[in-house]
């Protein structure tokens, strides 16, 4: 870790600790807020689940109540059907059509009521399943109508898929239901038939329990109890149809109560075999059991509240009649009064035993209810404590997770800071290298600028020289052109003068010849014909003055002199000649002056001295020298122009290089400034990162200490609990 800059002010330790405490308090407040939100969400979800469970329990209780009511209705129909068949067979062996229709209408009415109730229940279940997306319910809500409160699915499946009823059971049950008095008469006829009746009654009770009992098969004790009740009732002297119905109803009520107790005991034994009772407590509905017990108690109280005096009276008074009727039915056997008294004692003993067994069953049922309520309370307390511990555990886990997340984030930030520091240091090294390279380039550019300035100065000097040379060349060209013009004019004048001289000589000769011919013609009287007249024709025009004959050329010269007499023309020609001569002299003077100027410039003063004599050779040599000098000057001029073009190109190239170097130097300066600013910024960021790292290390140590304290507190709480 690098050292901070010298001019940086470090924050005091107290301020840093206060900032850390504030940060920790902020983190704790945020964690508490998140935890409170989480707890609220959990509480809301728990309330929703409880409401859903209550609703399902209500629906299940309604379903079970309707199912039990349907079973009770079916049982009542069967009992009434059996009672009616018993009465009809005892009193009216043949029924009328109206009675049969009334019985059928009553049964069908009750069946329709049960069917309507079951259809309403199925429609309610169907609508609920569709409204809630056919979600999975518990196994209790999907049981069949044949299943009872504590019905075992295995027994139900075995009952549904197996057919345990045999022909013997069918015959026995049909015989019992169709003609119970016949069995009673046969019982009175012989004591052996009494035992057969007991066996048939026990078998009928077994079959009836297997058919109408939805709570599973009966135990042998229950079968023996039911058979003993029937046998005692049959053997009593005051046995009537009402007593039979009351006994059957009381037997059914006690049987339902015992079946509920036994089914609950079987359920708890099965649940103990499967696992624990607490996990299966939710499958038991206490209100249904209590309602069933209340119903069975009411039925039992209604059936067994008759006074014992009636039983005793009915047992003592018609003993002789019964014995006489039995004796009349079977004359071969006689019943002893001692045996009847012993049988009555046995019957009362059996009744006492039955009441004791029922009392024990009721006591066991109450104890079972109390234990079940205690188990439910313990289960609720355990669930509450478990929920609290779970909440505390989740809170601690959440705090640990948040602290782990904070530590991981700080570690990631540390790694990110280290990586950024390395990247910035590498970038700084690259920028330093680029700065050194740019400094070297800048030095080269400065050297190029210096060379450019030198070249510009040299170019300016050359340009001045070229300007002076071009001016001189231009002047020389002008002078040469002017001299060429003058020379051409002088040559023309010279030729013209030579022509004039020749013409003058010719004219003089012709004049002399003419004078001689005139003299001779005057002497002889002849006329000279000019040469230009063809065929010897003579012009008949009148000639003013004397007659003169001249040549063709002389005539042209005279015509060019103008009109007038020959003397006037000759005087004109003589004046023009003098003028031409004066012009020639002037031109010669000017030529000499120009030659003197040229001789001063080229140092050829001595060469022009011979021109005064008018020699043509010297003039030709001078002309050649002038032409040679002109060609040399032209060559120098073309060379100078080429040098000028090359220099201009090099100047433009150097100017472009200078511009590029200037832009590069400016960019380098900008980059250097940016690099310096970036370096300062990186140094500041490095210092802030180091400060943050130190603060994070201190906060990390504080958080680790707090985490250790929380772990110690948690272990202490767990040890206390």
Swiss-Prot record:
Note down the stretches annotated as region Disordered.
232-262, 295-338
> As annotated in Swiss-Prot or TrEMBL, what is the tissue specificity of this protein?
Widely expressed, with highest levels in heart and skeletal muscle.
According to its UniProt entry, one GO biological process term is: regulation of DNA-templated transcription
Spell out which residues are annotated as carrying Phosphoserine: 18, 190, 202, 309, 312, 320, 324, 328, 332-333
Q: Give me the stretches of Polar residues compositional bias.
A: 237-251, 305-338
Keyword tags: Coiled coil, Phosphoprotein, Wnt signaling pathway
Domain of life of the native organism: Eukaryota
Residues that bear Phosphothreonine: 331
Which Gene Ontology molecular function entries are recorded, alphabetically?
Answer: LRR domain binding
Q: Which residues form a coiled coil?
A: 22-49, 349-524, 566-714
| InterPro entries tied to this protein | LRRFIP1/2
Family membership, please give it: Belongs to the LRRFIP family.
Functional note: May function as activator of the canonical Wnt signaling pathway, in association with DVL3, upstream of CTNNB1/beta-catenin. Positively regulates Toll-like receptor (TLR) signaling in response to agonist probably by competing with the negative FLII regulator for MYD88-binding.
The name this protein carries in UniProt is: Leucine-rich repeat flightless-interacting protein 2
């Amino acid at each position: 870790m690098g050292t901070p800059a010298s001019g940086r002010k470090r924050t005091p330790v107290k301020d840093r600790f206060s900032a850390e405490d504030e940060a920790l308090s902020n983190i704790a407040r945020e964690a508490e807020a998140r935890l409170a939100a989480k707890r609220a969400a959990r509480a809301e979800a728990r309330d929703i689940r409880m409401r859903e469970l209550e609703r399902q329990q209500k629906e299940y209780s309604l379903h079970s109540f309707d199912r039990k009511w349907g079973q009770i209705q079916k049982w009542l129909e069967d009992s009434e059907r059996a009672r009616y068949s018993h009465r009809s067979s005892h009193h009216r062996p043949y029924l009328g059509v109206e009675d049969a229709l009334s019985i059928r209408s009553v049964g069908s009415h009750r069946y329709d009521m049960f069917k309507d109730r079951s259809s309403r229940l199925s429609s309610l279940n169907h609508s609920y399943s569709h409204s809630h997306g056919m979600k999975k319910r518990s196994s209790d809500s999907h049981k069949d109508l044949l299943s009872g409160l504590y019905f075992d699915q295995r027994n139900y499946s075995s009952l549904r898929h197996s057919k345990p009823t045999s022909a013997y059971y069918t015959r026995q049950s049909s015989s019992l239901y169709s003609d119970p008095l016949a069995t009673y008469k046969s019982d009175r006829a012989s004591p052996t038939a009494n035992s057969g009746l007991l066996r048939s009654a026990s078998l009928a009770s077994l079959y009836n329990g297997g058919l109408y009992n939805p709570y599973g098969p009966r135990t042998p004790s229950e079968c023996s109890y039911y058979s003993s009740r029937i046998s005692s009732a049959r053997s009593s002297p005051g046995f009537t149809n009402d007593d039979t119905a009351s006994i059957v109803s009381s037997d059914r009520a006690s049987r339902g109560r015992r079946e509920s107790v036994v089914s609950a005991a079987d359920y708890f034994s099965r649940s103990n075999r499967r696992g624990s009772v607490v996990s299966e407590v939710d499958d038991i509905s206490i209100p249904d059991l209590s309602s069933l017990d209340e119903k069975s108690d009411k039925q039992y109280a209604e059936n067994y509240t008759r006074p014992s005096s009636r039983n005793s009276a009915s047992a003592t008074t018609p003993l002789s009649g019964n014995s006489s009727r039995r004796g009349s039915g079977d004359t071969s056997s006689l019943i002893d009064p001692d045996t009847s008294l012993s049988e009555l004692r046995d019957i009362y003993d059996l009744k006492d035993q039955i009441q004791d067994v029922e009392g024990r069953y009721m006591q066991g049922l109450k104890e079972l209810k109390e234990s079940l309520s205690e188990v439910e309370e313990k289960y609720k307390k355990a669930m509450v404590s478990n929920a609290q511990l779970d909440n505390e555990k989740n809170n601690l886990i959440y705090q640990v997770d948040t602290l782990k997340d904070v530590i991981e984030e700080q570690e990631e930030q540390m790694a990110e800071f280290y990586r950024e520091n390395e990247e910035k240091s590498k970038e700084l090294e690259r920028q330093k290298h680029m700065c050194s390279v740019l400094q070297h380039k800048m030095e080269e550019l400065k050297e190029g600028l210096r060379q450019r300035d030198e070249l510009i100065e040299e170019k300016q000097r050359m340009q001045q020289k070229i300007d002076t040379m071009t001016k001189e060349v231009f002047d020389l060209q002008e002078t040469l052109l002017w001299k060429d013009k003058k020379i051409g004019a002088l040559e023309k004048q010279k030729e013209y003068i030579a022509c004039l001289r020749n013409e003058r000589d010719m004219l003089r000769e012709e004049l002399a010849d003419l004078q001689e011919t005139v003299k001779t013609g005057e002497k002889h009287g002849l006329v000279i014909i000019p040469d230009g007249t063809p065929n010897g024709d003579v012009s008949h025009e009148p000639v003013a003055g004397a007659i003169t004959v001249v040549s063709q050329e002389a005539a042209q010269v005279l015509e060019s002199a103008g009109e007038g007499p020959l003397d006037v023309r000759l005087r004109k020609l003589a004046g023009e000649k003098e003028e031409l001569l004066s012009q020639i002299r002037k031109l010669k003077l000017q030529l000499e002056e120009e030659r003197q100027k040229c001789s001063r410039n080229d140092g050829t003063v001595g060469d022009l001295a011979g021109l005064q004599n008018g020699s043509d050779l010297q003039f030709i040599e001078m002309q050649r020298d002038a032409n040679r000098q002109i060609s040399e000057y032209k060559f120098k001029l073309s060379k100078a122009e080429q040098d000028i073009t090359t220099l201009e190109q090099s100047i433009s190239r150097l100017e472009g290089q200078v511009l590029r170097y200037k832009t590069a130097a400016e960019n380098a300066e900008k980059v250097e400034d940016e690099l310096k600013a970036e370096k300062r910024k990186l140094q500041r960021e490095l210092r802030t990162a180091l400060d943050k790292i130190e603060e994070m290390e201190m906060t990390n140590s504080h958080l680790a200490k707090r985490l250790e304290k929380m772990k110690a507190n948690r272990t202490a709480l767990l040890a206390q609990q």
